[in-house]
UniProtKB/Swiss-Prot annotation:
It comes from the Eukaryota. One of its GO terms (cellular component) is cytosol. SUPFAM superfamilies: S-adenosyl-L-methionine-dependent methyltransferases. It comes from Caenorhabditis briggsae. It catalyses: [phosphatase 2A protein]-C-terminal L-leucine + S-adenosyl-L-methionine = [phosphatase 2A protein]-C-terminal L-leucine methyl ester + S-adenosyl-L-homocysteine. GO terms for biological process: methylation; regulation of mitotic cell cycle spindle assembly checkpoint. This is Probable leucine carboxyl methyltransferase 1. Methylates the carboxyl group of the C-terminal leucine residue of protein phosphatase 2A catalytic subunits to form alpha-leucine ester residues. Keywords: Methyltransferase, S-adenosyl-L-methionine, Transferase. The gene is lcmt-1. PANTHER family: LEUCINE CARBOXYL METHYLTRANSFERASE, LEUCINE CARBOXYL METHYLTRANSFERASE 1. Pfam families: LCM.
Amino acid sequence: MDSEAISSDSHVAAAIATRRRSNSVSDDYSVQRTNDDATQCKYFAIQKGYWKDDFIGRFANSSANVAEARRFPEISMGYWARTAAIEKYVRGFLEEFDGNAQVVSFGCGFDTLFWRLVSSDAKLAKYVEVDFSSVTSKKIRHILKPGGSVDLKKSFESEAVVSHHADLHAGNYHLIGADLRQTSELEQKLATCQLDHDIPTIFIAECVLVYMSSNTSSSLLKNLVSQFRHPAFVNYEQFRTSDAFTRVMEQNLGERGIQLHGLEMCESAEKQEERFRNAGFKSVKVMDMNQIFNQFLDQDEVARIRQIEMLDEMELLEQLLAHYCVVFARV
Ligand SMILES: C[S@@+](CC[C@H](N)C(=O)[O-])C[C@H]1O[C@@H](n2cnc3c(N)ncnc32)[C@H](O)[C@@H]1O
């Protein structure tokens, strides 16, 4: 067979594989793997000194090399800004209610915010993390594995009880395996965490809602407003999605079998506002990551971040930050 035929065959095969993946469980598998990317990028940025996290080393693969494109300073700055912004919103919320408040993290991946809060003596009533069972079971293994210099179990109020390999309950910390798109499965699993529906509760979705259809994420938000008396929501995801930047990103993700089913909600601040207001949230603030970087976050910290790896030009960073946003919504 000549080389052209081989290459066109492999093109066809790749296209068929992508189409198959997009409508099957392997689509979910590819989405779950985005957690590995986020963890490795955060681990890389932390090692560079962008921020301090004593816990991520338990979850990251310290021997894996981060792809060159993910080692650009712009990428590390973006990860720093998103982590810092979410942490600031959550800490502010917990302080506002003197710790008598709960945190629920949807699509938590290997996020370490629970440990960062507890180790800094932040007060909270309950912390619940949710992800696909295949992700939570891995997270549980990392939490419980012996050895290492940091013992994650030390942060728990009581001994960890694991069920079905995918759920862990330990005092005020809970990690549960559930598909956020499956309403009754999610509600059943959340019920095992005995959340108090009457106290203030902040929900986090860091790069998660975009993987679900707009209808599904909208009904998830509506359910929260109807079930919790004082919910707040901090959402980080793509933004300004109708230009070439997003098309290239979509194409790259598509080649890895990842579809962004909820991208239409990320088009503009108006779309985000509409989604949260329709779900019953009364106040909705949308900031793109340039605003987060230059106004919302501590400017001494921003100055320190800028020194770590000096950029020759700001255009790429500004372009990247313009395509992500944080939404903070309250009832
Ligand atoms: C890009 S990763 C982000 C992980 C973490 N929030 C962070 O920012 O480091 C997306 C996460 O959302 C989870 N996720 C996406 N769709 C989900 C669903 N329908 N149900 C449960 N988890 C989901 C994935 O498994 C993955 O862990």
